[in-house]
Amino acid sequence: MTNDDGIQSKGILVLAKALAALGEVSIVAPDREKSAVAHSLTLHRPLRVERIKKNIFAVDGTPADCVHLAVNAILPGKPDLLVSGINKGENVGNDITYSGTVSAAFEGTLHGIPAFSISLASRSHFRFQGAARFAVKVARHILKNGLPKDTFLNINVPNVPEKHLKRFRITYQGRVIHGNAVVEKVDPRGKKYY
């Protein structure tokens, strides 16, 4: 498991606890928030890894770094499944190109690991339990049936009480159009910043 919200995020901790019902869970996640870092890898400085607990590791890098290190250095073997999340906030439309959460699942797929990202469509008052239980259902299905080659899933769960999560839809990736506003300010030394 990994994420882009950091090793201390409640989303990854709730998800790890839920996924433990399916087998051994390892977490290799950024040591701090790394949202919107896309699929970047750290190439020009060393990466530090801190073992937090038996199967929990914090990396001072990006989510894609975490997956790369997990597969090639930290874990004793290739995992059966890679799950990235639970992200605080949805990952839809063009935003997936910036998402560390989604990119981590993509990185897993590049290593030949079935993978999915899971995000909670909210900006506050997160209901992680329902999303975690849904992730367990998806994980169980993938472990049993696999995914098509070179395919990963990007799952977005509404932030509603679990009893309202009764069905799912498979959709196509849409577009999100954001404004291009840039806020210019001046620091105390008279220098512009954005």
Residue ranges and their predicted role:
Residues 130-194:
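Electrostatically charged, flexible surface regions
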Residues 90-99:
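Glycine/threonine-rich flexible loop motifs
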Residues 104-108:
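Hydrophobic/aromatic ligand-binding patch that stacks against planar heteroaromatic rings
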Residues 2, 28-30, 60, 84-87, ...:
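Short beta-strand segments
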Residues 109-131:
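Glycine-rich phosphate/pyrophosphate-binding loops
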Residues 13-78:
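A cross-family phosphate/adenosyl-ligand binding-site feature
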Residues 81:
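Short, Asp-centered acidic motifs that coordinate Mg2+ and/or phosphate
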Residues 1-19:
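N-terminal beta1-alpha1 ligand-phosphate binding loop
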